[in-house]
Amino acid sequence: MVQEYDVVVIGAGHAGIEAGLASARRGAKTLMLTINLDNIAFMPCNPSVGGPAKGIVVREIDALGGQMAKTIDKTHIQMRMLNTGKGPAVRALRAQADKVLYQQEMKRVLENEDNLDIMQGMVDELIIEDNEVKGVRTNIGTEYRSKAVIITTGTFLRGEIILGNLKYSSGPNHQLPSVTLADNLRKLGFDIVRFKTGTPPRVNARTIDYSKTEIQPGDDIGRAFSFETTEFILDQLPCWLTYTNGDTHQVIDDNLHLSAMYSGMIKGTGPRYCPSIEDKFVRFNDKPRHQLFLEPEGRNTNEVYVQGLSTSLPEHVQRQMLETIPGLEKADMMRAGYAIEYDAIVPTQLWPTLETKAIKNLYTAGQINGTSGYEEAAGQGIMAGINAAGNVLGTGEKILSRSDAYIGVLIDDLVTKGTNEPYRLLTSRAEYRLLLRHDNADLRLTDMGYELGLISEERYARFNEKRQQIKDEIQRLTDVRIKPNEHTQAIIEAKGGSRLKDGILAIDLLRRPEMNYETILEILEESHQLPEAVEEQVEIQTKYEGYINKSLQQVEKVKRMEAKKIPEDLDYSKVDSLASEAREKLAEVKPLNIAQASRISGVNPADISILLVYLEQGKLQRVKQ
C-alpha cells in the first residue's frame, strides 16, 4: 500500500530536522526519511553551534519557532559570548556541544512531534509527473507519495572520503553515501557542482598534556540561545589552546605530495574560511604558527576534536604532525581526519522560497545548496519547511529579506549570486548588520513565528511583555530629568565624563559613550527592576539610535525597489538594449523584483534603468514568454 503525506523530507541532519519540524508544526502531515535513525542530528565535523553570524542565525531560528537553540541550550558543555569588546552588531554566542546528548535530545523531540513520522530508508529516486514532484521511491522499492519534497542530504550525495592516496565511496564519518539519488538529480537536468570539506583528527583526552596548553573556559554566567530557556548549565568544561610550530610545518612540507589536496586527487572546491592545515601552510607560509583548539566532544567521552587541523594527509603523517604539537606529543589518535567530496546543486536554480525552478513543489536546503555549517543548514531548513507546508496547505510562503535576518542574507546570496565554493555566512555579508544583531533576533522575527503558528501563546505573551517593558523604560528615561547636583557630577566624573552645566534628560545622558544603563540607575539611586535583556535593549536602542535610523532609511529605499515586481515568465531576449551578459544572468536567476535584479553579478545600473522604464511604462507585461 502506498503511503501518502503532505511533505516528505529526505535527510535528518540539521537542515532536515528544522524542515521536518517546521512543516509538521504548521500542520502538514510530514515524513522524514534518513539512511540511519541512529545518526539523526549527527555532527560529523566540529562539536559546536554558533559563532560570528552563525550564532545570530541560531537565535533567528529560535525566534521563528525552530529547535536548534533549545536543544543546544540543554546539551552544551560550554558557552561563551564572542566579541564582547566590540559593538553589538558583531557579538555572537558560541556553544560547545555534547555531540551524543545533542543527537539524543533531537531524536526525542522528533519522535514526540505530532504530524511527524520518522522512517529509516534510503531515497533513490524522486517521483516526477509533469515537472511536479509527487513523492519518493527508496532503494527497496517503497513509494511514499507526497505533495512536496524537501531534499536535505548534506554531504551524502555521491560522497567520497579521501585520505592521502586512498579514495572510497562514503558519506561523512564512514556512513553510507547516497549515489543513486545523486544520479537521479543529474538525470532530471539539475546543474551539479562538486564541493569538498574536511575534518581533523580526534585524540584521546587521557593522553593530552594540558600543562603545555592554554585553558579556554566558558562564561561564568548563564547564557542561552533560546528565548524559552530559563535554566542554565553552569557546570562547564573548558577547551584548550595550543599551536602548530616549525616542526609541524616541516612535516607538512615533507609530505605535501601525499596530500589529496595537492596531488590532484581532490577535484571539488573547498571552503575558503575553513581551510585544511596543508592549505594554511601553503597560503600563509609567512606565519610561524597556527592556532589549534582542543575541544571535548562530550561529557562521557575522551574524544577531543583538534580544531584547526583539518587534513587529507595520510594517517601516519597525521600522527607525525600531532607529535610536534605542544601537549599532543604523546596523544593517541582515536580517529584520523579526512576530506570528503560531494555533489551540490547550483543554487541559482532555486526561487527565494528554496523551491526549485525546474520542478514544482521540490525544495532543497542545507549543504546540497552549496553552504557549509550546521547553522546555515538549519536556517535554510526551517524556511524550506515553512514554505513547503505553506504551499501544500495553502497557508502561504515566507521570504525573509536581507534586512529581516541573516537567514535572508544567506538565501538571497545563494539564489541571486550563487556560489563557486562552500558558502559560509559572515557578518561582513550583511549590509544591515546593525539591524541584524544577536540581541534583537526575537524582536525581529517572533511576530512572524507566531503568525506561522510556530510560537506558542504562552511564549508570545512573554515576548510581548518584554517588548512593552523596553518601550515603557525608554519612555520613562525620556521623561526623567537629571539635575546637576554633586551626587550626579561625582558619578559622571568617575566615569570619565564632563560635568553637567544644566539638567539633562536621562535618555540623553545615556547616549554619552562613557555612560551605560547601570550608571543611569546609580545616578537616579534606583535598583535593577527589569530583566537584563530588557536593560540591554534599552541601552543599545538608545546609544545606536542614530545609526539604526540611518540603516532603516536605507531599508525603506530597498523596499521601494522590492515593491517593483518582475513577472516570473519574463522573456529577457525581448527587452531592448539590455547588455548580453545581463540578459543571460537575468534569464538564469529570474529575479522576483527590481531590488533582487540589482544584486545579480553582471547586471549593471544601466540594465536596471532599462527594466525600470519597461516596468513604469507597462511594457514588461508585453514581453512575457
Swiss-Prot record:
What GO molecular functions are on record for this protein? flavin adenine dinucleotide binding
Under the heading InterPro entries, the entry gives:
FAD/NAD-bd_sf, GIDA_C_N, MnmG, MnmG-rel, MnmG-rel_CS, MnmG_C, MnmG_C_subdom, MnmG_C_subdom_sf
Main localisation: cytoplasm
For this entry, list what GO says about its biological process: tRNA methylation; tRNA wobble uridine modification
Residues recorded as binding NAD(+), renumbered to this chain, are 270-284
State any GO CC term: cytosol
> Which residues does FAD bind?
11-16, 123, 178, 367
Check the record and name the PANTHER family matching this protein: GLUCOSE INHIBITED DIVISION PROTEIN A, PROTEIN MTO1 HOMOLOG, MITOCHONDRIAL
Q: Which family does it belong to?
A: Belongs to the MnmG family.
Under which name does UniProt file this protein?
Answer: tRNA uridine 5-carboxymethylaminomethyl modification enzyme MnmG
Q: What organism is this sequence from? A: Staphylococcus epidermidis (strain ATCC 35984 / DSM 28319 / BCRC 17069 / CCUG 31568 / BM 3577 / RP62A)
